[in-house]
């Protein structure tokens, strides 16, 4: 549609002024949905950069904080893009149901498993929403790592260009043994998603997952799932989704 083309053109124009974008792993993007696009989140620029990294025919649905719903400019744009507004202060079952319905209709659903923008320029402990959706919808997950977006704001303020990267990993699915996981098993699924994102990123971004035995196993080409289960048992409990 014309609006989609204009939005992409605007993002590309801004990018041309302030930096460059390299996309790695385009061959890993599925031809069609449904699937979950799980990405790290360090900058307000991440969503539009993901949008222009993806093929134009892929309409990406996504969660957005409720505060944007009535924004004069971004509100209408987000509604056009298919945003599902979510209350991030609680488990928003209404938003989760809408996301599951979208996946059931074949959508590509993008979200940051961390649930918010990281303020420490590295991965923070994720919430269980992405794992919940993937397990309930039975869809694959495409991990995405955004590189150098944490530098964008500072560099723009100092009129410096930023060389950005979108790194797309191979799609994967939760283990066949997982059926409607809860508790430790759901936390293990979340850990599995996050180490797949971490594996795409430079080590300086690993953050909360830097010492994960599961990440170490994945990087060695081994099955990380047993280590994910072990790690989840020692994790800080989260509210049940």
Name each region found by the language model.
Residues 2-3, 7, 16, 30-90:
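Catalytic core of membrane glycerolipid acyltransferases/transacylases, capturing the structured
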Residues 2-6, 94-241:
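Non-catalytic C-terminal accessory region of glycerolipid acyltransferases
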Residues 16-24, 147-150:
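Short gly/ser/thr-rich secondary-structure transition/capping motifs
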Residues 19, 89-93, 123:
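A conditional alpha-helix N-cap/helix-loop micro-motif detector
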Residues 22-32:
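Membrane-interface helix-loop junction between the first two transmembrane segments
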Residues 23, 71, 93-96:
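Structural motif corresponding to alpha-helix initiation and N-cap regions
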Residues 25, 64-65, 82, 112-113, ...:
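A secondary-structure boundary/capping signal
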């Amino acid at each position: 549609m014309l609006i989609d083309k204009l939005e992409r053109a605007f993002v590309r124009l801004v990018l041309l002024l302030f930096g460059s974008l390299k996309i790695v792993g385009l061959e890993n993007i599925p031809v069609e949905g449904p699937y979950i696009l799980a990405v790290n989140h360090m900058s307000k620029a991440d969503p539009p950069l993901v949008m222009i990294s993806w093929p134009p025919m892929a309409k990406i649905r996504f969660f957005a904080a409720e505060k944007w719903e009535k924004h004069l400019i971004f509100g209408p744009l987000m509604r056009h893009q298919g945003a599902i507004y979510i209350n991030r202060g609680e488990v928003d079952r209404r938003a989760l149901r809408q996301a599951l319905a979208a996946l059931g209709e074949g959508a590509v659903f993008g979200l940051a498993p961390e649930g918010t923008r990281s303020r420490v320029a590295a991965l923070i402990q994720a919430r269980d929403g992405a794992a919940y959706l993937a397990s309930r919808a039975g869809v694959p997950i495409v991990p995405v790592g955004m590189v150098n977006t944490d530098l964008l704001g500072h560099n723009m303020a100092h009129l410096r260009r930023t060389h950005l990267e979108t790194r797309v990993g191979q799609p994967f699915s939760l283990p066949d043994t997982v059926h409607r996981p809860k508790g430790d098993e759901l936390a293990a699924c979340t850990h599995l998603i996050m180490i797949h994102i971490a594996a795409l990123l430079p080590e300086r971004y690993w953050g909360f997952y830097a010492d994960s035995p599961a990440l170490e196993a994945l990087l060695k080409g081994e099955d990380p799932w047993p280590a994910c289960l072990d790690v989840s048992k020692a994790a800080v409990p989260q509210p049940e989704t």
